């Protein structure tokens, strides 16, 4: 049985995993790998700390919903209508860095390494944004992701939003298929040489739908 509920702080490790997986998509290395230059365990711990930071960034636990299958965490995503949560990212990363003993010199390199992401960002003003979608491999193709997305669309509708949007790495066909199954359609894509050189995907594709 699939149950969808709001995330809680104690879900932090799973939410961090979802954020890490979403940033990696279909690739072997994602934004966190490139920025942090650590192994997977290091990146996952950093991501976990982002979700429970005081700074309410787009990684914060309070923005997430999770889907459980018979009481087991299976999928997560976050959604928001206020893009100011993106601007809290540096503060959240600073908190995570301090907590992991990362010195200021190393932390200063994070945005230099990760700035390529800005080249391909696109957004529709006033739309509800869905981010950090992650589903455990054993639950992919079972309807869990669709149930979670449908729940998020309803949440956005109740909040008064008329449109929702979601972006992902170009080439992540599995994600695109899942999003199209709940009514999302192509809206825009951006490509940039520096983006592809850094991560191996030509850019980001954005889908949108009315709600």
Feature map (PLM): residue ranges:
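A short beta-loop-alpha structural element at the N-terminal edge
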Residues: 3-17, 25-30, 82
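Conserved GNAT-fold acetyl-CoA-binding loop/helix
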Residues: 23-51, 97-102
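Active-site rim helix/loop that mediates acceptor-substrate recognition in acyltransferases
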Residues: 37-64, 68-69, 115-120
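Conserved beta-strand in the GNAT
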Residues: 66, 72-81, 129, 134
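Conserved acyl-donor/pantetheine-binding loop and adjacent beta-alpha core of acyl/acetyltransferases
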Residues: 83-127
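Conserved catalytic-core motifs of GNAT/GCN5-like acyltransferases
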Residues: 83-84, 167, 185-200
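Conserved GNAT acetyl-CoA-binding A-motif
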Residues: 126-128, 156-167
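Conserved acetyl-CoA-binding loop-helix of GNAT-fold acetyltransferases
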Residues: 141-154, 180-181
